[in-house]
């Protein structure tokens, strides 16, 4: 699939402040920098086994509409009421600047690549082009139905690489450091 054939790249992310969501957000930001229409799509929980995908998609849709609702409220009323914690609840893993959110699971299934982390069982978005990025050890090592036979597998580090799924040892590593982490906000303006 060439760049011209790719309509969108959707990166499935989960909302928590941890290394996996940060790296997925950083991947989204880097893909956007080089010209791809990459977006994050949040899921409220991991799929740990076979589930009814229709019911799970409804749960995901409700969750993303709730995030959208919080974003709209924050945009309209951020000066009137302190919505910083209210907004953070909806976008807790979006600390990497330069990303875009996919709120609805509506996309061209043939011309979209969906990137799933290793903790997502199956293909809940029903995409035809799936990339599995192993950011940690494979939690479904003994379950052949967890991943599709045509999925493209990559690992974050060689130690996390499942050799049966990725014998070529394809590795994609992205480093991210929050430059605002040690910034002091309580200091006055510096003079002299």
Residue ranges and their predicted role:
Residues 95-192:
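Catalytic core of nucleotide-activated saccharide and alditol-phosphate transferases
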